[in-house]
A protein has these predicted regions:
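Aromatic-lined carbohydrate-binding/catalytic grooves of carbohydrate-active enzymes
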Residues: 25, 29-134
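Solvent-exposed beta-hairpin/edge-strand motifs
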Residues: 345-363
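Carbohydrate-binding surface patches
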Residues: 245-248, 253-255, 305-350
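Glycan-recognition surfaces
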Residues: 108-111, 139, 149, 154-257
């Protein structure tokens, strides 16, 4: 199968561990991915992010793994990861230095690509720090794409230029398999919802073999690790994040410490219904049915007893294979609210004689055919998700 036929899935070290990585940690993560159902669910890439090398290249011009962190070298790490039925990923940067100040691949693309291939790398995350002001961003990403292909090894190219120069317009053309479309995610509600809001109108450029990457998941981090910031997310907020990543059809790269991940978050990221939506073969983006404001009480202002916080009501509809649909409602406001939506806005006018037969993904409850409108009550910072089929309206 060609690379990235469906959104890539895996685990990346950065969100939790940052520079605190070593061989023992990577082996433990590989063991857990293989033994706790992640591999079977589709999480196949184990990726080491920044801070794995020495601060300077060797005399032969090649990047050298830090012998204190990886005493047996990267080939041994790759071999162990492969022995668990997983694929091995590494990190480099299009600049002269990585984001953490280690050697970047600028002007070393072909030698670095061959080094990665010799070690058995299957996935390269390619960052954008310390890029020369005179450099051509598109040209350097194309150069690394060519360098990877010149090795003869199949290596998934994960381009990470933070959304610079509208990557959705050219990353497919230069051979990337996924492209970061925003700055770094942080472990809080505002960060991940801002990312989604910035990308909803751009997802039609994402699809088979070249996916919009909304960054690694923070689900289950609970404020621990390298990207913790502000208030710790609730279960409902983490569920909202994971559902959005699945619904948007973007790569699912876990970032939490799998050794201490709470059971409810493991179950969430292994939920077969959600993963089936993410991995749907047609790779269609969701259609934006509604994106505006919820109506919530405003007791502090007698002149305006109701508030309408902007960009807080979302209704999204995603077409799936076999004439199935995923219907998503979200309330991003700070108060419980009803999210209203007319079926006509989903392409189902009353005169059509067709209703939407709905089943709640979270509870399993079959709600039956819905027509005219459907207006669920949703808690603050939470969502509802339904799998639906079209049925004749016999009323």
């Amino acid at each position: 199968m060609p690379l990235a036929q469906l959104p890539p899935m895996g685990w990346n070290s950065w969100n939790t561990f940052g520079w605190q990585i070593n061989e023992k940690l990577i082996f433990e993560m590989a063991d857990l991915m293989a033994s706790q159902g992640y591999r079977e669910a589709g999480y196949e890439y184990l990726v080491i992010d920044d801070c794995w090398s020495l601060r300077e290249r060797g005399k032969d011009g090649r990047i050298v793994p830090d012998p204190e962190k990886f005493p047996n070298g990267m080939k041994a790490v790759a071999d162990y990861v492969h022995s668990k039925g997983l694929k091995f990923g590494m990190y480099s940067c299009a600049g002269v230095r990585t984001c953490a100040g280690y050697p970047g691949s600028y002007d070393h693309e072909f030698v670095d690509a061959q080094t990665f291939a010799d070690w058995g790398v299957d996935f390269l995350k390619y960052d954008f720090c310390n890029f020369p002001q005179s450099g051509n961003c598109k040209a350097r990403y194309l150069t690394m794409s060519m360098a990877l292909k010149a090795t003869g090894r199949e290596i998934l190219f994960s381009a990470c230029n933070w959304g610079m120069e509208e990557p959705g317009e050219w990353m497919r053309a230069i051979g990337a398999h996924m492209y970061r479309s925003t700055g770094d995610i942080m472990d809080n509600f505002v960060s991940f919802t801002d990312i989604v809001k910035s990308q909803l109108n751009k997802l039609c450029m994402s699809g088979n073999h070249c996916f919009n990457d909304m960054d690694m998941l923070t689900v289950g981090m609970e404020g621990k690790g390298n990207v913790g910031l502000g208030k710790v997310c609730s279960y409902e907020e983490y569920r909202l994040q994971f559902v959005l990543w699945c619904l948007c059809g973007v790569p699912l790269m876990m970032g939490a410490d799998l050794r201490s991940l709470a059971p409810e978050y493991r179950a969430l990221m292994l939920n077969p219904a959600l993963l089936r939506i993410n991995q749907d073969a047609e790779c269609r983006p969701p259609y934006i049915v509604r994106r505006d404001s919820v109506c919530i009480p405003n007791p502090d202002d007698a002149q305006a007893p109701w508030a309408h916080p902007a960009d807080t009501a979302f209704v999204l509809l995603r077409h799936l294979t076999d004439n199935e649909f995923a219907l998503f409602y979200a309330n991003l406001s700070d108060a419980d609210a009803e999210v209203h939506c007319e079926m006509a806005d989903m392409g189902l006018p009353v005169t059509g004689g067709v209703a939407l037969d709905m089943t709640d993904v979270f509870s399993g409850e079959h709600l039956g055919p819905q027509k005219d409108s459907f207006n669920p009550h949703i808690k603050a910072h939470d969502c509802r998700l339904f799998l639906c089929h079209l049925v004749k309206d016999n009323a």
